[in-house]
Amino acid sequence: MIEFLDLPDPPCFLDTESIKLKENIWIGNKEIYGIYYCEDELTNFLKHLFPECDNFKYQLLRNGIPKHVDVDRAINYNYILQAGGNNVETVWWDNGKELYRTCLPEKKWHKFNASIEHSIENIETERVGISVFKYDSNAGWWHYPDESR
């Protein structure tokens, strides 16, 4: 479900307040989640690091993210800039049963299985990270079972 990667740190990235000044392109509840395009310098670095990928974005998460499946991708490469609290946990689920729970460290690349239902719990402030993936046009959009679109 999670694999830590020994990859170089991004040479540049925006601070949280600068990210929030960008356009939030998320189509769902923008109070709890945001997606923002990375600037060109960071995108070029990420394209070199992940040549198979075509999406390079910042994510901003707040408390209240429901269990969900990222159905527009199977694998995500993430780099957490700000954890969002001291005990923020990523939890994977199978039919309501917990499979695995972990606290992901800041400033460490990881490969994340986004095709299994998961949740982000105990966010106290804002969780901010860089998210990289290959878009699957046949998969559709995020599925939040408890959120109407």
Regions found by a protein language model. Give the residues of each.
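Nucleic-acid-interacting cores, centered on viral/eukaryotic replication and modification enzymes
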Residues: 1, 67, 137
